[in-house]
Amino acid sequence: MLTTLIYRSRLCDTVPFRDVETMVAAANVRNEHESITGILLFNGLHFFQLLEGPENTVKTIYQQICKDVRHYNVVELMCDYAPARRFGKAGMELFDLRKHGQDDVLQAVLDKGTSRYQLTYSDRALQFVRTFVLTDGKDGVYEIPPADSWDFIADAQDDNAAPSDAAEEICFQPLID
């Protein structure tokens, strides 16, 4: 089944832009072989990508993306089935937002659309694209440092704490507004 997956992430500070360009070129070759299409937006700090293709292939590629050390804070924004491809001709089209105005990027994304029903702003996936472009990808984003920079320090022992042999369950769940 044709699947659309959208995610965003943050580029590691140590990765130069030429590595991004090399990655895009390699992904285009792989995506063509795997029947994956989509777009990649980059604002100099954040990636926003829409992938579309066979469900298992999209999910496998996304799992590889999540493990890629060139970026972090990977957040899946949408995963849904689609009746047709939105970007059937683009293996992975890169839009560098630093080089184009907001309206120009939005129009270029619309121009790359191949759906028999032209992409419109009412399209759910395009609403994500539009929001990323218009907010410069930074508004409303709480940046979490990379996992390898975290330090967890225990607070002083609480007298009301459960005994050390008591079973504990802790669950961290990300919240997205």
Describe each PLM feature range:
Residues M1-D177:
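Charge-rich, low-complexity N-terminal segments
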